[in-house]
Regions:
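Extracytoplasmic/secretory soluble proteins
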Residues: 1-275
C-alpha cells in the first residue's frame, strides 16, 4: 500500500467544554500535567454539585494516551516500550521495558483511583468509556466536562460544530512521532484488481493533483462547498449549509492521499501546514 501523507505525530490531551470552563472560572492555561488537572476536576465537581447538577469531570482515561513512550509492538496498549528521553519520564528503565511494570504506571493508577474516589469520573467508568455514543451525547449536552483525545488539527473545530458549544484542546505533552504513526493509514490495491496499473495511476493522481484531491475530499464546488481564496474551501457555503447535511464531506478526507495537496476547510487554523 501507499501510506497516506497526513499529520504523522500524535499529541494527547483533553477536549474541554470551554463554555463550562469559563462559567466555572477555570483557567485551563495552568494545566500542563495530569496532576495539574486535579484542581480543574475538583472545581467542576464542586460547582456543578452546587448548581444541582452532576457533571462528570473526565472520561476516557488511558495510560498510553496520557504518557509518552515509543510502542515497540505497534499497539501501544500491549507491553513493550522504549522511553523517549526528551520527556524525562520512565527514569531508570532499560531501553526496552514493560511499561505496566513501571513506577510511572503505578503513579498513574494511583492518581486515577483518587479521581474516581472523589467522584470526578463516571460511577461506572469501564462501561461508560467504552460507549463513545453515550460519551458524545453527554459532552454535547453538558453532562460531561472533558474527555481524553489523541488530537488532530481541526478536530476541536469539528467538535464545536457537532456539540454547539465551545470546545478547546488542552495538551498534556508535546507532539510525538512514532514509527507506527507513519503506518497509520494507507491506500492499497486489491489483489483482485483487474487493472492494478490504473489503480496505482489514480493513487498517484490523488497525491499529486490538487483538483482531484480536493474533489475526492470535499466534493463538487458550488454543490458541496464554496472556494475561499486559493487554498481554502467553506463546507457551510457561507453559513447557508450545515456540513453534516451537505451530502458529501464527512471530515475524514485525510484518508485519501495527502491533505497537503488539497484545499483546507476554513475551520482549520491558517497555519495548519506548519502545525
Amino acid at each position: 500500500g501507499v501510506p497516506s501523507y497526513k499529520e504523522m505525530g500524535w499529541q494527547s490531551g483533553f477536549f474541554v467544554n470551554s463554555d463550562m470552563a469559563e462559567e466555572y472560572g477555570i483557567d485551563l492555561s495552568t494545566v500542563k500535567t495530569l496532576e495539574d488537572y486535579t484542581e480543574v476536576l475538583k472545581t467542576v465537581k464542586e460547582k456543578s454539585t452546587a448548581a444541582g447538577e452532576s457533571v462528570i469531570g473526565v472520561s476516557g482515561m488511558s495510560f498510553n494516551l496520557t504518557t509518552p513512550y515509543e510502542s515497540l509492538t505497534g499497539t501501544p496498549t500491549l507491553p513493550g516500550a522504549s522511553p523517549v528521553s526528551a520527556y524525562g519520564n520512565f527514569a531508570g528503565e532499560a531501553e526496552v521495558f514493560n511499561q505496566y511494570a513501571s513506577q510511572d504506571y503505578m503513579d498513574y493508577c494511583s492518581l486515577v483511583r483518587d479521581w474516581y474516589n472523589n467522584g470526578y469520573l463516571s460511577a461506572d467508568p469501564v462501561n461508560y468509556d467504552s460507549d463513545t455514543a453515550n460519551r458524545d451525547n453527554d459532552f454535547a449536552n453538558g453532562k460531561l466536562f472533558s474527555y481524553v483525545i489523541s488530537y488532530a488539527p481541526g478536530a476541536a473545530e469539528a467538535e464545536e460544530a457537532k456539540t454547539g458549544h465551545g470546545v478547546t484542546f488542552v495538551p498534556l505533552l508535546d507532539p510525538l512521532f512514532e514509527t507506527r504513526n507513519a503506518m497509520g493509514g494507507l491506500l492499497a490495491i486489491s489483489s483482485a484488481s483487474e487493472y492494478p496499473e490504473k489503480a496505482l495511476e489514480f493513487i498517484n493522481l490523488l497525491n499529486t493533483d490538487e483538483y482531484v484531491g480536493t474533489l475526492i475530499r470535499h466534493g463538487i464546488e458550488g454543490e458541496h462547498h464554496t472556494a475561499v481564496g486559493d487554498t481554502q474551501i467553506d463546507r457551510t457555503m457561507g453559513g447557508t449549509l450545515d456540513p453534516a447535511d451537505n451530502g458529501y464531506d464527512y471530515t475524514y478526507g485525510w484518508q485519501f492521499g495527502t491533505p497537503f495537496n488539497q484545499k483546507w476547510d476554513i475551520s482549520y487554523p491558517e497555519n495548519i501546514e506548519e502545525m
